[in-house]
């Protein structure tokens, strides 16, 4: 077993914010106090200029590296983050927070509503990607970080980092949106609606009050996960891994058990997911993604969202990603070009589908490495291990 040096050991913490004044949400409602759970890795340099914010995807959380507290599995981006890796914890100070509305420590529908002493459930206000980013900005205030070196995220994380560039352009030097888009498509909203309806149709959902009723809508949440997981893959990857191979049997059973390996795989994904994720959080976070549209506040003209920005961008897409296809990333790049923004674009050739950003994909890793090294050199960040603080 490889033991990480002390500076690269993850620190898992939480902080209560907005104690004196609530945070105003995009809906017009207010929320506070709110708790943000987060992980940090590495050391913040004396100038506080080497911080990277990693934004997680829909079903992710703050545990980028290290054993997950619920599943015991490795962190979701250990392929990329660590000493000497692409996102080098000897050089950068890494922050990742559980998003607002999440279910691993940050205020969300699973947590206790201080006004009632019971879980929020559907009493929790509907949130947006903008609200998630607003909470992250408050966390950075708490950590004493005025400006990020870089914000990086895939899928829903890409939405967050783009929102960072639009809402707080003066607080981030570089942004890397991976396998994302500037708005959620009709097809993706449709897939989310199928998942939400599966959850809400489960009798154990109890109108969203299942935690107070002592039930969990496991079946509905599992189906939602199974449906969504298909969109994270690709037909070539499914064909290569499963094809029409049978699951532990010599012939079909003429029944409705999992005859095919792909059926068994999806059932396994659903069963594992319900052990670590909250059903109401799934409703709220998918809705936040559906509402995401960077052009909405700019008369439908995306380029205006990036007008005058000094942020340096690297936009990454994958050839086999049909959830957020390359055309979506190209639209973002064209808008940035129209706004005279500093942007690089790379389409990575892979058959691994949308989830390629989570996997061992050398071309993607090399792309990210090159961009980070170039940006770090431009902004004067030193290479190698240095002493610093762990706020």
From Swiss-Prot:
Catalytic activity: L-homoserine + acetyl-CoA = O-acetyl-L-homoserine + CoA
Protein name as catalogued: Homoserine O-acetyltransferase
Ranges where the AB hydrolase-1 domain occurs: 50-360
SUPFAM superfamilies from the UniProt entry: alpha/beta-Hydrolases (SSF53474)
Lineage per the UniProt record: Bacteria, Pseudomonadati, Pseudomonadota, Alphaproteobacteria, Rhodospirillales
Keywords, comma-separated and alphabetical: Acyltransferase, Amino-acid biosynthesis, Cytoplasm, Methionine biosynthesis, Transferase
Subcellular locations according to the entry: Cytoplasm
GO cellular component assignments: cytoplasm
Gene: metXA
């Amino acid at each position: 077993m490889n033991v990480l040096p002390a500076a690269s050991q993850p620190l898992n913490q939480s902080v209560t914010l907005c104690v004196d004044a609530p945070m105003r949400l995009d809906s017009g409602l207010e929320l506070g106090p709110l708790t943000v759970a987060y992980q940090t890795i590495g050391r913040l340099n004396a100038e506080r200029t080497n911080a990277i914010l990693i934004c997680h995807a829909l079903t992710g959380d703050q545990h980028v590296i290290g054993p997950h507290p619920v599943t015991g599995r490795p962190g979701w981006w250990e392929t990329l983050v660590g000493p000497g890796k692409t996102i080098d914890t000897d050089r950068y100070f890494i922050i990742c927070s559980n998003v607002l509305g999440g279910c691993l420590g940050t205020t969300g529908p699973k947590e206790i509503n201080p006004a009632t002493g019971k879980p929020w459930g559907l009493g929790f206000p509907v949130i947006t990607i903008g609200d998630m980013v607003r909470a992250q900005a408050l966390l950075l205030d708490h950590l004493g970080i005025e400006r990020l070196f870089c914000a990086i995220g895939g899928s829903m994380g890409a939405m967050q980092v783009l929102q960072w560039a639009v809402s707080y352009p003066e607080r981030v030097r570089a942004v890397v949106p991976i396998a994302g888009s500037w708005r959620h498509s009709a097809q993706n909203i449709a897939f989310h609606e199928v998942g939400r309806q599966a959850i809400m149709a489960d009798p154990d959902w109890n109108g969203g009050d299942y935690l107070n009723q002592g039930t969990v809508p496991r079946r509905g949440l599992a189906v939602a996960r199974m449906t969504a997981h298909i969109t994270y893959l690709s037909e070539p990857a499914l064909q290569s891994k499963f094809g029409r191979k049978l699951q532990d049997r010599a012939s079909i059973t003429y029944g409705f058990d999992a005859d095919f390996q792909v059926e068994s795989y999806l059932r396994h994904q659903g069963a594992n997911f319900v052990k670590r994720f909250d059903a109401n959080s799934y409703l709220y976070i998918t809705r936040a993604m559906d509402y995401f549209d960077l052009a909405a506040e700019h008369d439908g003209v995306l380029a205006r969202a990036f007008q005058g920005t000094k942020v340096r961008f690297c936009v990454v897409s994958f050839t086999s990603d049909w959830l957020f296809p390359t055309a979506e990333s190209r639209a973002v790049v064209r808008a940035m070009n129209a706004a005279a923004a500093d942007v690089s674009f790379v389409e990575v050739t892979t058959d691994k589908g949308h989830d390629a950003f989570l996997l061992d994909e050398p071309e993607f890793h090399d792309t990210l490495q090159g961009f980070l090294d170039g940006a770090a050199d431009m902004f004067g960040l030193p290479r190698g291990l240095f002493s610093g603080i762990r706020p």
